[in-house]
Amino acid sequence: MNKIYSLKYSAATGGLIAVSELAKRVSGKTNRKLVATMLSLAVAGTVNAANIDISNVWARDYLDLAQNKGIFQPGATDVTITLKNGDKFSFHNLSIPDFSGAAASGAATAIGGSYSVTVAHNKKNPQAAETQVYAQSSYRVVDRRNSNDFEIQRLNKFVVETVGATPAETNPTTYSDALERYGIVTSDGSKKIIGFRAGSGGTSFINGESKISTNSAYSHDLLSASLFEVTQWDSYGMMIYKNDKTFRNLEIFGDSGSGAYLYDNKLEKWVLVGTTHGIASVNGDQLTWITKYNDKLVSELKDTYSHKINLNGNNVTIKNTDITLHQNNADTTGTQEKITKDKDIVFTNGGDVLFKDNLDFGSGGIIFDEGHEYNINGQGFTFKGAGIDIGKESIVNWNALYSSDDVLHKIGPGTLNVQKKQGANIKIGEGNVILNEEGTFNNIYLASGNGKVILNKDNSLGNDQYAGIFFTKRGGTLDLNGHNQTFTRIAATDDGTTITNSDTTKEAVLAINNEDSYIYHGNINGNIKLTHNINSQDKKTNAKLILDGSVNTKNDVEVSNASLTMQGHATEHAIFRSSANHCSLVFLCGTDWVTVLKETESSYNKKFNSDYKSNNQQTSFDQPDWKTGVFKFDTLHLNNADFSISRNANVEGNISANKSAITIGDKNVYIDNLAGKNITNNGFDFKQTISTNLSIGETKFTGGITAHNSQIAIGDQAVVTLNGATFLDNTPISIDKGAKVIAQNSMFTTKGIDISGELTMMGIPEQNSKTVTPGLHYAADGFRLSGGNANFIARNMASVTGNIYADDAATITLGQPETETPTISSAYQAWAETLLYGFDTAYRGAITAPKATVSMNNAIWHLNSQSSINRLETKDSMVRFTGDNGKFTTLTVNNLTIDDSAFVLRANLAQADQLVVNKSLSGKNNLLLVDFIEKNGNSNGLNIDLVSAPKGTAVDVFKATTRSIGFSDVTPVIEQKNDTDKATWTLIGYKSVANADAAKKATLLMSGGYKAFLAEVNNLNKRMGDLRDINGESGAWARIISGTGSAGGGFSDNYTHVQVGADNKHELDGLDLFTGVTMTYTDSHAGSDAFSGETKSVGAGLYASAMFESGAYIDLIGKYVHHDNEYTATFAGLGTRDYSSHSWYAGAEVGYRYHVTDSAWIEPQAELVYGAVSGKQFSWKDQGMNLTMKDKDFNPLIGRTGVDVGKSFSGKDWKVTARAGLGYQFDLFANGETVLRDASGEKRIKGEKDGRMLMNVGLNAEIRDNLRFGLEFEKSAFGKYNVDNAINANFRYSF
């Protein structure tokens, strides 16, 4: 308000108006009488010039709220602030209004288009509202209407920086109606009308009895907010409110015209209910009068400046002040109307508009309604005016020019499709603007966050360092639409800016090529590849691109010879004064009020460590509120580059680096001192001032890293989740104190890993599943733990290899309780068994950590070198001593606690691995196992110490047990004794016996050659039998056989056997002789609970069949088969073996077909097959013991006798022969011998003979004269190995 206002009744306005107490013929006494008369209120003298109460609220909170800064973002809910007494203040749980409609002076509020509202008496003070500034645009008042001091103003341009405040759509007549529409339930449970006001009057800060005067009014820096309660709804057409007693900002001179907002429960949004009129003091409380929003008055002014033209699909021509409407687009004289300058032309229902002259609409613009298409043609003529307003879902195809000496303002949610180069600047507040020409506009200004620029041609932006596009407060969107775009810098002032590519089929490259430090505050998303490449032979460390907004793309990011930083953004706050204090002479000007304010709040800032609240800086390195930047991409490619992730950044994506430095959790952060204010020069220039300092906050990275000749540093408060495979070649990595790295995928490094923080290595969790695949982790130079806070963890199906070194009291954790161990993915069960030995975690390496603590739970440690530990605690775990070249190993522990665990030590006849405990050994239910890597039968007389511990150690800490090693059960003989200085567990001998179960499993595996031979034998004679059934001729044939078999010991197999061949018929005296050749392929799979694998076989053979006229026949066949085998065994540590073998076959069958009738027969038969099966041998080590398993070459001889019966059925054009058979197959020779050898000796297992009953049924059919088809089912029974089911299908084509 202008100075201090009293209230006076006005006959002209029909209500109260505010009149300066300094005005002529008005006195405080006169005013008091008027107020007492009209309002029945007692006004106690003049109102004190006091407004912002900072006794319990920081000054900055009032300013942040009005300027929508800090936590007070539009729409924010559950907002609370901390008061200076430490209490919380919640604003009655109201959401935060959008105050962007407030002009910079605070004395007027935009309501959309070219209109704003204020109070009429502000006209006396041009600073208040005669010229209104929004962001970088200034607007002049060109006309007004007012009533009861409420004033609606028309501006010379459409306001692009804001869509404006939403006006109240209704004016309740009573308080109860208003309470229903605008009331909210307050924190005390009562329903009240609570609202906000934003203005910038003559600001003073009150702290108790002291006052800090700013001597400033209408300053945008000091735009502040009030929280109020409406106490009277209607008083001479106005409402009355009082300020909140805690968040207390009393209106003062200069606040006149500022907007008052209430939450509309029906619309569910904040609405502008009026403008601030005047103040009065009643019983010591200040009351504020709000002149209500006058929708009728607003509509009258808008109607005055609107010229509506219904095109209805037709066209109009505009020349000078004449507008001519042509019906049905006919180019004839039509209806003419006069255009009044400064009026808005409102087009409806679509159509064409043709300019036939240069048009200057003054403060008038062109408005297009919703949902239609318009074509604007200019024939080289220009338009100039307030701007263009396009309704929702309307398209305006702009083929005219805008005047180059003015700036086009575009608002409305519709689309402006610009088809011609304009040679002018544009400011965009809402909707889409499509650019179809190179350099369509000289410069583009985007504001409010509601506008979008769409590129529809290469180079459609400018060619300067900013590409001629500027994003002011809340910015807007640039859609590359499949076009590449290069910037030196993007002129964006906040995260309201978004650069996207909506073309899902064509990637757009966004290149940012700054060679000096630059911060981009906006967002990047869509189908975009981001690059920051500097053309240089050397790395340009000054070419630092800093992203503190967000990236969300499935494409790559590329950086070469430059630096890239991803970080959060220090939240901007209000400042008290942006300009410097121009008076440095304290004795003349007094102490600068900004300094006084800072000193006033210093004690509270010291208490709460909150100097940043009073330092007159919009951002500070020490402030706690940083916006988290989220950055998602596919792969970041670094070449001779630096990449850092600083505080409050969350990065997701893979990294591929070459000769680069990667820092995750970088302490160096960057602040743009002009953030939010970067855009200058009426909106078409950009300034940035960057400060850098140290500031630590949480940093996250999720992805995998591949790096060559690079370096990686993980800093304090960084959380790194390596869920992608990580391969580091000649790339050291360090993990600082306070950092956490979680490797959820395999990790390999040719260097070491330095750990001062925490490293966790795990298996690979499967997406959308609770199962886990084992993860492999390997560090060639080991893991180096530094300091007492270093933490090394391996769990959740992790297999880790690499020595561990710790120089202090670090913590090393291996495994986790069995109850927490996840399910292993079914596809990796066998692999997990090999890697983890049935434990949760496996570790291979030595641990040198004389001050550290190692904890093992459900883990196995393969100890392969000398190790020393301060404290070792194990549960449900195993420590297994291993080593190369027969070297024995010693584990030295100061304090050892073991429960339900096992120690496996190796021993020969003279030496052994040793466990040395210096201070304490305790525990129960533990096994002491011995791997005998050298034995010579039962042996006594050994004297080898395995464990030594302090004197008095309980004798039952360990117990010896029998171990299955190789094909033997070995039992160590261990003597426990307590000498004068120590307790020892000494190996004095061992006993070994054959392990029948291991031998059985080995024999079952080695019998695979015999079973493969048998499968081939069963299929040898199939072809010759077919020839007898079909009275065949010379021809070609094919057969496929699929079957399954089983044997004792859980053995089962399945196979698919394919035969192809051709034969020739020779008609001789008294017999038919068939000779032929065959090729075969067999794919078989076999397994048991002890092994599994497959055999692929290929073979070739010759056969002959002589069929005598008497019914007798003789079949002969010879065949060779080559086998490729791969089997994995789970016994005796055999693992997976690949080997080749072969076999020979020679078979003869004789029989006689006796015809019972012409179509039925009985056929007794006998077969003998002799063969050769190659042997095989495997040699390996199990737990240090040398093992050999082999079977020799052997020659099977297999006989078969049986009888077949059959009958033929025929018709005119068909014939089918059905048959059934029953036989017995038997071994004449025993199959091969298996030899097993381990350190306890040799075991020979003789082969056995087997026999089985064979059964089959089948048929052969003549499909055509020269085409035959056969099908047969068979199985066997009563053998040690049986064919459970087999099906045989064959085809023959006769020549």
UniProtKB/Swiss-Prot annotation:
Q: Which GO terms describe its biological process?
A: proteolysis
Result when mutating R140K = In strain: Nissle 1917
Q: Where is the Autotransporter domain?
A: 1029-1295
Q: What does changing Y612H do?
A: In strain: Nissle 1917
The protein's matches in Pfam families, at most eight in alphabetical order, are given as: Autotransporter, ESPR, Peptidase_S6
GO MF, one annotated term: endopeptidase activity
Record's keyword terms, sorted = Cell outer membrane, Hydrolase, Membrane, Periplasm, Protease, Secreted, Serine protease, Signal, Transmembrane, Transmembrane beta strand, Virulence, Zymogen
Any idea which residues are catalytic in this one?
H121 (charge relay system), D149 (charge relay system), S256 (charge relay system)
Q: Which InterPro entries match?
A: Autotransporte_beta (IPR005546), Autotransporte_beta_dom_sf (IPR036709), Autotransporter_pectin_lyase_C (IPR012332), ESPR (IPR024973), OM_autotransptr_brl_dom (IPR006315), Pectin_lyase_fold/virulence (IPR011050), Peptidase_S6_dom (IPR030396)
This protein's GO cellular component annotations are: cell outer membrane; cell surface; extracellular region; periplasmic space
Summarize what the UniProt record says about post-translational modification.
Answer: Cleaved to release the mature protein from the outer membrane.
* Domain Peptidase S6: start-end pairs: 51-300
The protein's site described by Cleavage is found at N1018, N1019
What is this protein for, i.e. what is its function?
Answer: Shows serine protease activity and displays cytophatic activity, including elongation, rounding, and detachment of a proportion of the cells from monolayer in culture. Triggers vacuolation within the cytoplasm of the human bladder and kidney cells.
UniProt comment concerning the protein's domains: The signal peptide, cleaved at the inner membrane, guides the autotransporter protein to the periplasmic space. Then, insertion of the C-terminal translocator domain in the outer membrane forms a hydrophilic pore for the translocation of the passenger domain to the bacterial cell surface, with subsequent cleavage.
Matches recorded under NCBIfam families:
autotrans_barl
Q: Which named protein is this?
A: Serine protease sat autotransporter
Give the organism's phylogenetic lineage: Bacteria, Pseudomonadati, Pseudomonadota, Gammaproteobacteria, Enterobacterales
